[in-house]
Design a protein with these regions (language model features):
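Signature of N-terminal electron-transfer/Fe-S-associated modules in redox systems
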Residues: 1-156, 597
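Short beta-strand elements
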Residues: 46, 174, 180, 250, ...
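Glycine-rich loop/linker segments at domain edges
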Residues: 90, 165, 171-177, 307-350, ...
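Flexible, low-hydrophobicity surface segments
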Residues: 145-310, 330, 416
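C-terminal catalytic domains of large/alpha subunits in multi-subunit enzymes
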Residues: 226-227, 381-386, 416-421, 450, ...
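Phosphate/diphosphate-binding loops
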Residues: 258-259, 264-266, 418-466, 673-694
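Helix-loop-helix junctions that connect adjacent transmembrane helices in secondary transporters/permeases
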Residues: 295-380, 544-614, 695-720, 788-798, ...
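Thiamine diphosphate
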Residues: 397-418, 422-424, 628, 634-635
Length: 863
């Protein structure tokens, strides 16, 4: 027992427990976010006697007489300042890390009211952010310090909410102050908890499952196995190959496979009961990598498949082999890129509530409420009106929350027990379960003429897609179609194969396969520049695709193509670095916006004038931190002339909001933005006719947009693989003395920047994420196909490790005739970073590396 003070009130704790559990579960102070429970991420920071401390570390019995402060306990003035400063700086994206950042900032500013930028970065070194790249969080802390010193709030720099305005995001306050709800922040009467009994082996056959001891444990409500599933057993994003539960006689495919589910009155009982479920296995040889998977006589990951090949892609145009044979210069290299963990700050969580009609309502953190509805309804064997899904705040995704993780398990337990169920993955489960970035091995050959003009590229790609299909096929396709780079040449051929293994599944990750093949193409182009005797900038400028040019996939690009403009934007900084003798690396990239390649790609939006006299925006598109809600409000303001206060953004749900597809593929700003614009046209017509919002109460205005494209290989004069591409040039400058990065420059063509503040944040965040990909991040898997790293050992960059300067250059190239010309930027920001960094280190050391993460840098782990 211990007595201490929390936010000015004395509390007595009878049961010894981690402080985070007491604050969240008993006091419901949900600004204290649970990101890892391992002392690694910093989302649970509180002040203990004025010192920032991770609440997941101390036990309550050790806190006698201490004074504890959470964000809820800040003064009203402090809350106003941090909300304004973080909003003005653009410091908030998914928001899950932000209350912890605020606490660390207060710990600094209470003792140092005028810190330097370096001191602010050091103060949040124990707080990880995966979205922002820290730049704007540090800006927010310094602005807060300035406001505290001045004693009054300034006016916001922009508040007109037109497209192009640097407005504060609409969700800033709830995220800064921690009262916005992620699923784990939800507590309801009678709520019980769920957990999964997972396989002990990567490949084995289940011989028996005995749940009797677990069922007899006091506090256990139910233990479910495959026989309890009322509908279809398998789920899966595209291919239904992932069993909700593995049944007796069936193969487990990786260590994350579930064989039973436990539902109990609290999480402690869940964990105890899981240990009492007895599973007998026939252990079988596992498939560890694509080489083993492709070997003659290899074990099959799936009984029902004829081979371990999950996907095959062949993309060809012209005569690559002939062009390379006749080229002046030819280079061939083998490249290898690693598995990468998304490491979003919010672990997967779902709260399932029973509906009066016998169905379930799911409160989720995922990238598509409608996809979750489709898969869970199929598993339960119910109609869609018996499976409702509501997005809560989403604490980051980056592709890692496209697949089922906990939603189907929460739905099943709720459906069986008729009780509210919270189902959350531990951080280690999250690291094991959700799909990762594919590791790839790639062989590339490039030929150029004497002027450095690309004549042809030929390549092969092999990816490890792990235990399930997930999005392995589309990722492989995108890796292949974009491997040619954003350049104008005709001869291109690439073969790609994705293999099933018994590793954790791989799927969507920011960049969607392009991050891997871009590393190859851009590295070869840098080598080729040296052979030809021109600069890496010049070789790109000569080859860059321009309006009216033809990409290697056959698509004639339009006037919105802005690659040259991004090259020109970084040219002054590039020339200065070369003049100063700084080691400098450069790389370009392109990335599609939208699904493309002939697949129907719908954006949908419904504007409803509700009883409050305001326009409510409903779309099935998930806002996962990228700022979609703010974008849609700006679209409505711009296209209707209404005031911001007349508009309400509603989070995605499945019973009112129309399906607008997954938040992936950099698509939502374009496709849902255009659908929203079309809905606005109808509303504007009524307003122009003299009607007021009061007159329009109860009226709905629907907009939809189909991004029409052609399938790969379509026999048409101008095959349109994608409705739009984003283009980028990034540059890395090293400090020759320390060998560390002193500046990153990233110029990105976004068409129209709906909110330049958010665009800059996306650029900075993508750059820092891929700095980790290039230099430090790792996802080691042992001989048992088990990932071995904890969250704190993944190699994620921290605030005091980023370069002194990350310059985001927003290039606006008009020409796109939808969504006001806006192109999504979520993915491309992370694509050219690694090859730019790799070339900078070659310029420093004279040694070129073809595998990631780079080994010969000051960032590499000490041997």
């Amino acid at each position: 027992m211990a007595t201490f003070t929390v936010n000015g009130k004395s509390v007595t704790v009878e049961k010894n427990q981690k402080l985070i559990r007491f604050l969240r579960d008993e006091l419901h102070l949900t600004s204290v976010k649970d990101g890892c429970s391992e002392g690694a991420c910093g989302t649970c920071h509180v002040l203990i006697d004025g010192k920032p401390t991770k609440a997941c570390i101390p036990q309550t019995d050790k806190l006698e007489g201490k004074t504890i402060l959470t964000v809820e306990g800040l003064s009203d003035w402090e809350k106003q300042v941090y909300t304004f400063a973080f909003g003005e700086a653009g410091a908030v994206q998914c928001g899950f890390c932000i209350p912890g950042m605020v606490i660390s900032a207060k710990g600094l500013l209470d003792v140092n009211p005028d810190p330097t930028r370096e001191e602010a970065a050091f103060a949040i070194r124990n707080n990880i952010c995966r979205c922002t790249g820290y730049v704007k969080i540090i800006d927010g802390i310094l602005l807060a310090a300035k406001i505290f010193r001045a004693g009054k709030l300034p006016a916001p720099s922009a508040d007109d909410w037109q497209m192009g305005s640097r407005v504060h995001r609409l969700d800033v306050e709830e995220k800064v102050l921690g009262y916005g709800q992620y699923p784990d922040d939800i507590y309801v009467d009678g709520m019980c908890y769920g957990g999964a009994v997972r396989s002990q082996y990567a490949r084995a056959r289940v011989l028996s499952i005995d749940t009797s001891e677990a069922e007899a444990l006091p506090g256990v409500i139910c233990v479910a196995t495959q026989k309890d599933i009322p509908g279809k057993v398998n789920v899966g994003h595209l291919k239904k190959d992932q069993p909700t539960l593995i049944g007796v006689g069936e193969l487990v495919h990786y260590l994350g496979d579930s064989v039973a589910l436990v539902c109990a009155v609290d999480q402690e009982t869940v964990e105890a009961a899981k240990k009492l479920v007895k599973v007998e296995y026939e252990v079988l040889p596992a498939v560890h990598n694509p080489t083993e998977a492709a070997a003659p006589g290899a074990p099959l990951v799936f009984d029902e498949e004829e081979s371990n090949v999950q996907a095959y892609k062949h993309v060809s145009r012209g005569n690559a082999e002939g062009a390379i044979k006749n080229a002046k210069y030819v280079l061939t290299e083998h490249f290898s890129t690693p598995w990468t963990e998304h490491a979003f700050l919010e672990p997967e969580c779902c709260v399932a509530l029973p509906l009066d009609n016998g169905g379930v309502k799911l409160l989720t953190t995922d990238q598509s409420a409608h996809t979750t509805m489709h898969e869970c309804a199929s598993m339960l064997g119910v109609d869609y009106d018996h499976c409702q899904v509501q997005n809560c705040l989403v604490g980051g995704g980056f592709g890692g929350k496209e697949d089922m993780s906990v939603q189907h398990h929460a739905a099943l337990l709720c459906y069986l027990t008729k009780r509210p169920v919270k189902f959350k993955l531990s951080r280690q489960e999250s690291i094991l379960v959700h799909p990762k970035r594919h590791s790839m091995d790639m062989d590339f050959t490039m030929g150029c003429d004497e002027n450095g003009i690309i004549q042809g590229v030929k390549a092969s790609v092999v990816s490890d897609t792990g235990a399930f299909a997930s999005l392995g096929g589309p990722v492989l396709e995108r890796a292949c179609t974009h491997a040619a780079g954003p350049y104008a040449y005709e001869n291109f051929e690439i073969e790609g194969r994705a293999y099933y293994t018994n590793n954790p599944p791989a799927g969507a990750f920011r960049g969607f396969g392009v991050t891997q093949t871009c590393f190859c193409t851009e590295t070869l182009l840098n080598q080729m520049a040296d052979l030809v005797g021109i600069s890496p900038w010049e070789i790109r400028y000569r080859n860059a695709i321009r309006p009216g040019g033809v990409l290697p996939n056959g698509q004639i690009v339009d006037d919105s193509t802005g690659l040259v403009e991004t090259l020109e934007a970084i040219k002054p900084a590039y020339d200065e670095a070369v003049k100063n003798g700084d080691p400098v690396g450069i790389a370009c990239a392109m990335k599609n916006a939208g699904v493309g390649v002939g697949i129907p790609d719908w954006g949908r939006c419904k504007l409803i004038v509700e009883g409050d006299g305001k326009v409510h925006i409903y779309s099935g598109a998930s806002c996962i931190g990228q700022g979609l809600g703010t974008v849609l409000v700006q679209v409505v303001v711009t296209n209707t002339g209404l005031h911001r206060d007349d508009i309400v953004y509603e989070r995605s749900n499945t019973w009112i909001a129309p399906d607008s597809g997954d938040t992936s593929g950099s698509r939502q700003t374009l496709v849902t933005g255009e659908a929203t614009r079309r809905a606005c046209e109808k509303l504007k017509a009524e307003l122009d006719a003299g009607k007021s919002l009061a007159d329009l109460k109860g009226t709905e205005f629907y907009g939809e947009y189909l991004a029409k494209t052609d399938p790969l290989g379509a026999d048409v004069p101008n095959p349109v693989s994608h409705v739009a591409y984003g283009y980028a040039t990034q540059m890395c400058i090293l400090d020759r003395d320390t060998g560390r990065i002193k500046k990153m420059v990233a110029a990105h063509d976004v068409g129209k920047a709906v909110n330049p503040l958010s665009v800059e944040g996306q650029i900075e965040g993508g750059v820092v994420m891929s700095m980790g990909y290039a230099l430090t991040e790792k996802y080691p898997i042992d001989e048992n196909c088990k990932p071995t790293a904890k969250y704190g050992m993944l190699g994620l960059f921290r605030a005091n490790q980023i370069p002194p300067e990350i310059q985001a250059i927003v290039v606006e190239k008009p020409g796109l005739n939808v969504a006001g010309g806006a192109i999504g930027i979520g993915e491309i920001t992370s694509i050219p970073t690694a090859p730019a960094i790799a070339d900078a280190y070659y310029r420093l050391t004279g040694e070129r590396e073809f595998s990631l993460p780079l080994k010969n840098t000051p960032y590499a782990p000490k041997k």
